[in-house]
Amino acid sequence: MSRYEKLFSSLAARKEGAFVPFIMLSDPNPDTALAIVRAAVAGGADALELGVPFSDPVADGPTIQASHIRALAGGATVDSAIEQIRRIRNEFPDLPIGMLIYGNVPFTRGLETFYSEFQEAGADSILLPDVPVREGAPFVAAAEKAGIDPIFIAPAQASEQTLQGVAQYSKGYIYAISRDGVTGTEKESETRGLDEVVNNVKRFGGAPILLGFGISTPQHVADAIAAGAAGAITGSALTKIVDAHLDEEGRPADGLAAAVTGFVSKMKAATKHAES
């Protein structure tokens, strides 16, 4: 069984959903990013979604765009991201690690090299947010050859053909988005329509569904699971906490780890009070 399969099986047995925080590697520097990861795991994170900083993050809203910029300003590279994954994997051998990486990176490094080096570092899955499933065939082939689960986004207003492709080719989990657009708490999830979003994806079977985009409160998490999702992913709300605990020079304040742990703990608790 893969780490994702073990996780979702264990959570289902306990009647819990998954809470997965998104954390930008190298933001504001590798050591602080690792401290944020540790704090999130201490708060009960079931898996991680880790971002690799990129200069043109088209799927992200202002908060996570700023995180990309901070990390790049500090000298972030793909190689440093890979080294951070190794460190995280060594500390947390059983934790599923998903990557969110823009499609220019695998093109630059070569598909086979890209997937194999992330797999060797300890990543379980890779989501390329700017690569739709209709363009995914070469990425899926390279990912599966390397032993990486390819992840695709199921847009809120996707066609049946798109959803069928997402269900067919996503392994590990399916990233369903609660509303179309970019990431961010500026536009919170349309919780009243979550049942429809989840059911549209579920019709085609496939991997467990994690709901993302605009998930910023424990109630959003509970609503996602009540709608039938296997869990929820939060990025911008956590990134705002990081941003609020950095000084003008980008140095972390003493309370950063405690704030991250507290936030994740509350979000994780919401996975235990809703029936999927």
From Swiss-Prot:
Enzyme class: lyase
Molecular function GO labels: tryptophan synthase activity
Protein name: Tryptophan synthase alpha chain
Catalysed transformations (reactions): (1S,2R)-1-C-(indol-3-yl)glycerol 3-phosphate + L-serine = D-glyceraldehyde 3-phosphate + L-tryptophan + H2O
Key words, A-Z: Amino-acid biosynthesis, Aromatic amino acid biosynthesis, Lyase, Tryptophan biosynthesis
EC number(s) recorded for this UniProt protein: 4.2.1.20
Assigned GO CC terms: cytosol
UniProt xrefs under HAMAP family: Trp_synth_alpha
Membrane-crossing residue ranges in chain numbering: none
Role according to the record: The alpha subunit is responsible for the aldol cleavage of indoleglycerol phosphate to indole and glyceraldehyde 3-phosphate.
InterPro entries in UniProt: Aldolase_TIM, RibuloseP-bd_barrel, Trp_synthase_alpha_AS, Trp_synthase_suA
Subunit structure: Tetramer of two alpha and two beta chains.
Protein's UniProt keywords contain Amino-acid biosynthesis: yes
Domain of life: Bacteria
Associated pathway: Amino-acid biosynthesis; L-tryptophan biosynthesis; L-tryptophan from chorismate: step 5/5
Record family assignment: Belongs to the TrpA family.
